[in-house]
């Protein structure tokens, strides 16, 4: 399903500012993804299992850090999924420019 969103701006400079803001946000998402993947690798190395295995088969009692370790690992995995989804949406966005001003 496709959704169309229209943003009216006063001038072309405003459009450039919006596009730049989106690019900056995508860069921040990429950095967040990298940081989160590093954290997940740390958990995987510490416990000797993949995040997928952890999410499918493990409980808090299975980890040396118990509940807190479990919650942090699961939270990082959930965060990664959300960041990747958001970045994917923005990367698939299409932008079109039209002039709706009556004097042009």
Predicted regions and their residues:
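Extended, charge-rich alpha-helical interface modules
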Residues: 1-104
């Amino acid at each position: 399903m496709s959704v169309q969103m229209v943003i009216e701006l006063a001038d072309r400079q405003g459009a450039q500012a919006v596009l730049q803001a989106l690019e900056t946000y995508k860069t921040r998402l990429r950095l967040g993804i990298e940081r989160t993947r590093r954290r997940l690798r740390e958990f995987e190395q510490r416990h000797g299992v993949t995040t997928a295995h952890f999410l499918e088969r493990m409980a808090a009692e299975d980890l040396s850090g118990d509940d807190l370790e479990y919650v942090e690992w699961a939270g990082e995995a959930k965060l990664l999924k959300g960041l990747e989804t958001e970045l994917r949406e923005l990367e698939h966005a299409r932008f079109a420019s039209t002039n709706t001003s009556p004097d042009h």
